């Protein structure tokens, strides 16, 4: 019985050992390719090593590479994409930040980093990143979808709190009612209008988006009520 237990344990261990050995061989070849000036080949080998054993590839990145080269940035991109695909979002974020330090206005990296931040639960930073994306590319569909929904939901929450506070007033004075209406106008200008701009752009880019159309109808109705 003990023999079979050991046998199965060895079988289970073999794939991970083989992957580690494969990654080690590939990373040795990465070093050789870099020494020979074969950057594209080195990146291809590094991608394979990352797939075989991402932990070894990560250690290689931090300990063996000159970080001041375009090739090392491409390898950081490989690690970022790999960790994001495998839902290791903390590490993915770390490598996206490596990329953004070198190229802070790269839209593709900003979008990927924003997605990662959402998965990490940092909605505020995702919003900041998507806002930067729109500043660089006003037609970015993903940023417009996220921000349109984000601004709308934030405005809805603010409006709900304002309405609840107003309902608690047994006999509101004209001054209190005026403040309530001004509060609604401020929420509309600071939230609903921004959501409207993003979602209108979504419909221009993606006319079949029923969700964007539905939210825009709700904003239009509220706008009419405020006039």
Predicted regions span which residues?
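N-terminal leader/linker segments that initiate helical-solenoid repeat arrays
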Residues: 18-63, 69-74
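Conserved structural position within tetratricopeptide repeats
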Residues: 51, 98-101, 131-135, 197, ...
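Short coil turns that delineate tetratricopeptide repeat
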Residues: 54, 70, 104, 138-139, ...
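TPR alpha-solenoid repeat register
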Residues: 58-60, 75, 109, 143, ...
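Canonical tetratricopeptide repeat
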Residues: 62, 78, 112, 146, ...
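Short coil/linker segments at helix-helix boundaries
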Residues: 62-66, 153-198
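Short coil/turn linking the two alpha-helices of tandem helical-hairpin repeats
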Residues: 119-121, 148, 153-162, 223-227
């Amino acid at each position: 019985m003990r023999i079979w237990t050991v046998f199965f344990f060895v079988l289970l261990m073999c794939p991970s050992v083989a992957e580690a050995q494969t990654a080690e061989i590939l990373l040795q070849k990465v070093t050789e390719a870099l020494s020979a000036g074969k950057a594209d080949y080195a990146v291809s080998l590094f991608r394979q090593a990352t797939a075989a054993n991402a932990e070894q590839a990560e250690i290689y990145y931090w300990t063996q590479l000159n970080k001041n080269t375009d090739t090392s940035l491409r390898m950081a991109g490989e690690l970022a994409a790999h960790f994001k695909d495998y839902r290791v979002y903390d590490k993915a974020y770390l490598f996206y930040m490596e990329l953004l330090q070198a190229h802070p206005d790269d839209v593709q990296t900003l979008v990927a980093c924003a997605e990662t931040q959402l998965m990490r639960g940092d909605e505020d930073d995702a919003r900041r990143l998507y806002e930067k994306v729109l500043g660089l590319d006003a037609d970015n569909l993903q940023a417009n979808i996220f921000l349109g929904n984000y601004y709308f939901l934030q405005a809805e929450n603010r409006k709900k709190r304002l309405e609840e506070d107003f309902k608690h007033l047994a006999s509101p004075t004209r001054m209190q009612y005026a403040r309530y209406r001004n509060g609604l106008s401020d929420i509309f200008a600071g939230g609903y209008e921004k959501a409207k701009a993003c979602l209108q752009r979504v419909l221009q880019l993606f006319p079949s988006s029923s969700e964007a159309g539905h939210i825009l109808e709700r904003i239009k109705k509220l706008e009419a009520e405020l006039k």
